[in-house]
Structures are given as C-alpha cells and as structure tokens.
C-alpha cells in the first residue's frame, strides 16, 4: 500500500487516490476507484495512463533510454543474441550456458509447421500481402495445438509461447516465398535463428547456400532492437485481447493486426518510400525546406520519434549495423544509399533538426539495412512482427500470471443523442 495520496476535488467533493512509485520513471496515481465517485478520467490515446504494472521493458524518452529487464538495449545488441533476449524477456534473467542451450534446442524442435498449415497458403490470392498471410496463419495455429490451450496452466502458456517464437520465422518466410512464387524451404536445425530465417527466405531446393554471417548478425540485431517497446499500440492490443481469455495465438494475431497499421509498424517502409520520392541528392535541399514548412504536408520520415525526445538508443546500433551490411554487399555507391547517407549528414548538422531533436531513428536505418540485405519493403512489417512476437507473448504471460489480471473495459465520454422515441417509418420526415 502507498502512504502518499493525490487529492482530486470536483462537484463539491474531494477524493484521495494512492500514489505509487516505480523503480524507474514517473509516479503513477491509481484512479481505478474514481468511477465510484460519479466521474471517469478522460485520456484519449492513453498518453498519461498506465494501464498495467510491468517488469519487462522501461523507456525514458527524455534521456533516450531503453532497457529490457534492466539491461540497456545497446549492450544486449552488442553482447547477446536474439535467443538470449527472448529468454530474458520471457523469464526475467539472461540464461547461463546450459539454460541457453536447452532453450535454443527447444525452439528448434518447434520450428516446423503441419503440412495442413502450408496448404493454407494455396488459398490466398497470388498477390496477397505477406502480412495478411502471416496474420491469418498465426491465428489458425490454435486449430492445431489443442494440447496447450489451457491458459490457466503456466506450462501450457510457456509451450504456446515457445511455439509462437519458433514458428513465426517459418510462416514469415513462407509468406514471402508464396508471394514470389517460389517453393517453401524447410528450417534447418544446424543454423541459428537468424541464419535459418535468411535460409528460408532466400534459399532454394536446387542449391545449398549458407547465409552471409554479416547479414545474419545484422538480422539478429534487427530482431533484438524490435523485440519489445513497452506498452505500445500492438502490445496493448495483445493485452486487451488476452484479458478476455482468448488463446495466445488469437492474441498475437490481434497484435499483428495492430502492427500492420501504417502509424505503428510501417515507419521503415515509409522512410524508404520517402527516399525514393526524393529521388536524387540534388533534391534534398528542396525536401528539407518542405519539411521545415509547417504548411507543407511533406514529413521527413525516419527522423524524430513519438517517445524519444533525445536520440533513439536503437538508432546508434542500427546505424553501425547498416554500414556493416552496406560494406558486406558493396552497395554504398548505389543512388538510394548515397542519398540516404547525404540526408543523414545534413540532418545531423542542420540547426533546425538539432534544435527540434529530429535525429535519425531506428526506422531510418532498419529500412535501409533490410533493403540492402535484399528484402522487399512489403516484408518489413512482417519482420517487425517476427521480432516483436517475443515481446507480445512475454507481456501476455506476465498479465496472465498477475493476481490483478482482469477484463479490460474502458469507459467513454458520450456526446451522442439523449434518449428519444422511435418514430414509425411512414411518419419520419424526408
């Protein structure tokens, strides 16, 4: 219980609410009993509302800090791999050697999907968006795994989480292969998580190929950097769906649906499209001028962030990774990448961008990196969903194990008509 109180006065009454202090971040006022006093709180978009208590991820947007279970994101990207980060997000601690080996082995045992699942793809139109295919097949997995759908059992919840993390790259790669008319590639247990994904994306049955280690490491970092980001729109969607008692496959499918929205998961694709629109280095000045004009609808994508008012901590890691990939594939001198590097330099030196703290964000570099690897832009959000699956399922597991777990039921400020009588059709005015 909290000894500190916040007092709210309204309608000739004064009500006290407990104030809770987090281990990091701003204090939280618990107003859940406000409705008992004849009023509700209005916070459109939840920008000042903590909808849950969580121990998973912390963000300080003012200072440019992102922590997974207390570990800085740049250290995890440098010293760990995605499988370690998955273990960390799910269980709260980084694994030791034995724990990691067991976890990786378990993931690899669940990477394959039923043959009936692969037949789902034949029902999609030839030009279906990969996100539509992934969303549908993830939701359909609940039809195949009845053995672990008792969400009241921790062991069932854990097994479902493992299956989702393991099968997501397989289904993501299948969505890409189907979209380009190539045969599916089966996962190979000898490869690590990122290598396996690249193998299933770009491999063919006609030749044995090994993914470039630089590209595999880059993909692993992309997975790490996008693994979780606190209570964003898609994570909140997963939690709300989970609060109803829906199975985890349905909940993750709901999260994918939310992520598909261009305001959430499409930023790196939008950034790449912007670069193509600018077209040439000689046009940068014109578009910089447009970006500074409040009356111009043009927005410079990939710069600044809704949460981070400082440098996005993921961007520094992604910048380094981007340059490593460009070196590995020899694409530094292609017009698109030369344009991006020039734009980055101008933005980092221009007083307007410095004053507004419009630094290049993770989306600016991740879109370039994925493009350099050879991944088309319609797969960018799929890869985002693949990366974020562990974050979603970790939040779902945390919520399901919480004694405060309850059905989400927001209120509203109703501004519609007051009660009125129904008039028969023949008496209604034209």
Swiss-Prot record:
PANTHER family per UniProt: CITRATE SYNTHASE
Keywords annotated in UniProt: Allosteric enzyme, Transferase, Tricarboxylic acid cycle
GO biological process: tricarboxylic acid cycle
Lineage of producing organism: Bacteria, Pseudomonadati, Pseudomonadota, Gammaproteobacteria, Legionellales
GO CC terms in record: cytoplasm
A UniProt-annotated Pfam family: Citrate_synt
Miscellaneous comment as given in the Swiss-Prot or TrEMBL entry: Citrate synthase is found in nearly all cells capable of oxidative metabolism.
Superkingdom of the source species: Bacteria
Activity: how regulated: Allosterically inhibited by NADH.
Uppermost EC category: transferase
EC number, UniProt record: 2.3.3.16
Catalytic activity: oxaloacetate + acetyl-CoA + H2O = citrate + CoA + H(+)
GO function term, MF aspect, one: citrate (Si)-synthase activity
Entry protein name: Citrate synthase
Pathway: Carbohydrate metabolism; tricarboxylic acid cycle; isocitrate from oxaloacetate: step 1/2
């Amino acid at each position: 219980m909290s000894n500190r109180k916040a007092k709210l006065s309204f309608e000739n009454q004064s009500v006290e609410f407990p104030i809770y202090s987090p281990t990091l971040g701003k204090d939280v006022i618990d107003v859940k009993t406000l409705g008992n006093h004849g009023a509700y709180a209005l916070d459109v978009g939840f920008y000042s509302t903590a909808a849950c208590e969580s121990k998973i991820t912390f963000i300080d947007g003012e200072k440019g800090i992102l922590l997974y279970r207390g570990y800085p994101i740049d250290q995890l990207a440098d010293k760990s791999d995605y499988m370690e980060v998955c273990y960390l997000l799910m269980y709260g601690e980084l694994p030791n050697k034995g724990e990691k080996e067991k976890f990786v082995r378990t993931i690899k045992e669940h990477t394959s999907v039923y043959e009936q699942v692969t037949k789902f793809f034949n029902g999609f139109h030839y030009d279906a968006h990969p996100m539509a295919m992934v969303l549908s097949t993830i939701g359909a997995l609940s039809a195949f795994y009845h053995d672990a759908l008792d969400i009241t059992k921790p062991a069932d919840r854990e097994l479902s989480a493992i299956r989702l993390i393991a099968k997501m790259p397989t289904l993501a790669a299948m969505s890409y292969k189907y979209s380009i008319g190539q045969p599916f590639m089966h996962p190979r247990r000898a490869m690590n998580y990122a290598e396996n994904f690249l193998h299933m994306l770009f491999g063919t049955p006609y030749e044995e190929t090994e993914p470039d280690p630089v590209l595999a490491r880059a993909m692993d970092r992309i997975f790490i950097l996008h693994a979780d980001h606190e209570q964003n729109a898609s994570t909140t969607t997963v939690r709300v769906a989970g609060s109803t008692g829906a199975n985890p496959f349905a909940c993750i499918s709901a999260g994918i649906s939310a992520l598909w929205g261009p305001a959430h998961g499409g930023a790196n694709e939008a950034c790449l499209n912007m670069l193509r629109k600018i077209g040439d280095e000689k046009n940068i000045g014109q578009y910089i001028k447009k970006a500074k004009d409040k009356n111009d609808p043009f927005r410079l994508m990939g710069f600044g962030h809704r949460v981070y008012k400082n440098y996005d901590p993921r961007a520094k890691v992604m910048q380094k990774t981007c340059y490593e990939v460009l070196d590995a594939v020899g694409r530094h001198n292609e017009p698109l990448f030369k344009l991006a590097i020039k734009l980055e330099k101008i933005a980092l030196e221009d007083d307007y961008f410095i004053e507004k703290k419009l630094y290049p964000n993770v989306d600016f570099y991740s879109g370039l990196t994925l493009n350099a690897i050879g991944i088309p832009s319609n797969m960018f959000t799929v890869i985002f969903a693949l990366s974020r699956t562990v974050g979603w399922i970790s939040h779902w597991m945390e919520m399901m194990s919480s004694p405060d777990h309850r059905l989400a039921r927001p209120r509203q400020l109703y501004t519609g008509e007051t009660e009125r009588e129904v008039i028969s059709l023949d008496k209604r005015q034209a």
